[in-house]
Regions:
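Transmembrane helical cores of multi-pass secondary ion antiporters/exchangers
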Residues: 2-470
Length: 470
């Protein structure tokens, strides 16, 4: 053996062994190489396929999920099993590395979502948003729980409480996705329209309710107690956490932000915000809830701080959106196994879940809109727009799989529901919105924002005042 080969072998052996007296174990050289290769491949494919999806007018989420599907059990494991076993070994200790990066990504993504929560906007929408969101949540939740009790054994992990599985499925089917909906409304130039504002405000309420419902159901899954007792305990702990966040957490967050603002540049502020996200996430996780709830609540507290300009956190948002979030969704695709759909029982159950998800959300939103005295076309537009599940449903599915509530088959079905509903929402919304005549106020707002977006053109003072009042 050459001296170079001997040195390489010696180095590999030394890196594979824990160092005496080291505070933490050292990652073996081969494991580190595999991890870096996984990370680079997932990010590269997710970015490429995400851009390709966007080029065809589809959500980038679809391409990012496909990145994981391509090199996961659905395709690579069948086309090249040896390569799959080498690239993605089924050793949990090794897969946890890539999973940890994805979890960090989703924590920061949800935290940034919470930062953009506009409570004033919700108050302005008032009664209509409350009715639409209430029925839009309850109808699909009830239907999802109902079919959850009818699910075949292939969809449920052995030993799982049927009530917990049914609740998980109900939560997955009742949520809506703010990022996907906001992107659709922006691309269709509906954000300035009253219907666009109402869809967005209702989806915000859905999003907030979704995180809390997910946390309660997750607590039930891990409580190991009777469902009723565990539910009461979870709700009590959740109420204590929210109250403490409003009374103590808000002041603590404001103090940290003021302290960080004294640093030079935005780097200290970005680091402080990241630390706050992680600490709040750790607290909710310690209480038995999902860590993402803590990140969301922390984001809402940060966003409500009058001293913070959210634009200063743009570098963090860019990094999360461009790097960490695509890796998370690619890892979500890795856990899908489309070959499960070859089982007629799973395929039939999947089609039923998809039909219930679409019909339940549509019927609930339509009913709420009609109760709020909206027109038929406005109700149809709301049903179509709120049907987009996207990001939050993928997160719900990931949580269910990690907690051992969902099988690979049921996980795959739920993620496919997120993909299909995100793809079908734009054409249905476009069809309904085109039949809603714009009001004079909406025309003024559209002209105002067009003027802002046109280089070298500034609306006059009277025009600005009129647009804002509209």
């Amino acid at each position: 053996m050459s001296s170079a080969a001997t040195l390489a072998a010696s180095l590999n052996t030394s890196l594979s062994m824990p160092l005496a007296g080291a505070p933490v174990a050292v990652i073996p050289a081969h494991h580190l190489m595999t991890f870096l290769l996984q990370l680079g491949l997932l990010l590269g494919l997710a970015t490429l396929l995400g851009r390709l999806s966007a080029r065809f007018g589809l959500p980038a989420l679809l391409g990012e999920l496909c990145a994981g599907i391509l090199i996961g059990p659905s395709l690579l494991a069948n086309a090249a099993p040896d390569l799959f076993a080498w690239l993605l070994p089924q050793d949990p200790a090794r897969f946890h590395l890539i999973d940890a990066v994805g979890q960090l990504g989703v924590l920061l993504l949800v935290g940034m979502t919470g930062m953009h929560l506009d409570t004033g906007f919700l108050r302005r929408q008032g009664r209509s948003a409350a009715w639409i969101s209430g029925t839009g949540l309850l109808v699909p939740l009830a239907l999802g729980v109902g079919i959850g009790f009818l699910a075949p054994p292939e969809m449920i992990v052995g030993g799982t409480d049927p009530m917990v599985f049914a609740l998980f499925l109900g939560v997955a089917l009742c949520v809506s996705a703010i990022p996907v909906i906001a992107k659709i409304l922006t691309e269709m130039r509906l954000l300035h329209r009253d219907i666009g504002q109402l869809i967005l405000s209702t989806s915000v309420i859905d999003d907030v309710a979704g995180w809390f419902l997910l946390s309660v159901v997750s607590a039930l899954a891990t409580a190991g107690a009777r469902t009723g007792q565990a539910a009461l305990t979870a709700i009590a702990l959740l109420a204590v956490f929210v109250l403490a966040s409003l009374l103590i957490g808000r002041r603590a967050v404001a103090a940290v932000l003021r302290l960080a603002d004294r640093g030079q540049g935005d780097r200290t502020l970005i680091a402080a915000v990241t630390v706050l996200f992680l600490l709040f996430a750790a607290v909710t996780h310690a209480l038995g809830f999902e860590a993402i709830l803590g990140a969301f609540v922390c984001g809402a507290l940060i966003g409500s701080s009058p001293d913070l300009k959210v634009a200063r956190l743009a570098p963090l948002q860019t990094f999360v959106a461009a790097v960490l979030a695509p890796i998370f969704f690619a890892t979500a695709g890795l856990r899908m196994d489309l070959t499960e759909l070859a089982n007629p029982v799973v395929l039939g159950a999947g089609l039923l879940v998809l039909a219930v998800a679409i019909a339940g959300k549509f019927a609930g939103a339509y009913l709420g809109a009609r109760i709020a005295r909206r027109t038929r076309w406005e109700a149809l537009a709301l049903g179509a727009g709120l049907n987009s599940r996207g990001v939050i449903e993928v997160i719900v599915a990931m949580v269910g799989l990690r907690l051992g509530v969902l099988t690979t088959a049921s996980y795959t079905v739920i993620v496919l529901v997120a993909v299909v509903t995100s793809m079908m929402a734009p054409p249905l919304l476009r069809f309904a919105a085109s039949r809603i005549a714009p009001t004079e106020d909406e025309v003024v707002r559209e002209e105002f924002f067009d003027a802002l977006e046109t280089p070298g053109q500034t609306p006059d003072k009277q025009f600005v005042t009129t647009a804002k009042e509209a």
